Regions:
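Enzymes that bind and transform nitrogen-containing heteroaromatic metabolites
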Residues: 18-180
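Residue-identity detector for glycine
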Residues: 12-17
Length: 180
């Protein structure tokens, strides 16, 4: 069983057992036009990118919107699944936390001993734009016809590329950090 949480801090302890601050990282795959979805689904399938996503996010927390949650067949394994929703009566599940707003997610900072990956969808990316410290962006070599969900314009403004890695011949991922 993966443990994501520190012991609850006591008054004055400032996060008992913390070894590092939680980083908030956006992770996304985008086509040439910034598309991330079509009819509520990821409009491509690249095994190398899915494997990369799993490697990056395993052992961490992943925050997603309810629509993204619905596209999953089950909770992402070995990750704390944080689902943003205002819906009532959602089913309790192991390794899934249901939260209602951005502030509730940010309050996890005092308790998590892992990073928080913002994994989508578009509304959730918009909500956390000001909080994301780093981006991990897979560039999909397509222009998806009929795409209906896009990344917010300028989401990488104020960030600089630090590293690029090839996942496949035509698929690359770029790591961005907030410019200081």
């Amino acid at each position: 069983m993966v443990s994501w949480a520190h012991e609850a801090p006591t008054p004055g302890s400032r996060g008992a057992g913390r070894t590092k601050d939680m980083a908030i990282i956006g992770i996304v795959a985008v086509d040439r036009n910034g598309a991330i979805g079509k009819r509520g689904q990821l409009p491509w399938h690249y095994s190398a990118d899915l494997k990369f996503f799993k490697g990056q996010t395993t052992g961490n927390a992943c925050v997603m919107g309810y629509k993204t949650w619905l596209t999953l067949k089950r909770p992402l394994p070995n990750r704390l699944n944080v689902v943003l929703t205002r819906r009532e009566g959602v089913e309790a599940r192991e390794s899934v936390v249901w939260l209602r707003d951005r502030e509730s997610v940010l309050s996890l900072k005092d308790y998590l001993k892992c990073d928080l990956y913002v994994i989508g969808g578009a509304q959730v990316f918009r909500v956390f734009l000001g909080e994301i410290e780093r981006w991990v962006v897979t560039e999909v070599p397509l222009a998806v016809e009929g795409a209906d969900t896009f990344m917010p314009a300028g989401f990488l403004e104020g960030f600089r590329a630090e590293d690029t890695r090839r996942l496949e011949d035509d698929l690359k991922v770029t790591f961005y950090a907030r410019a200081v």
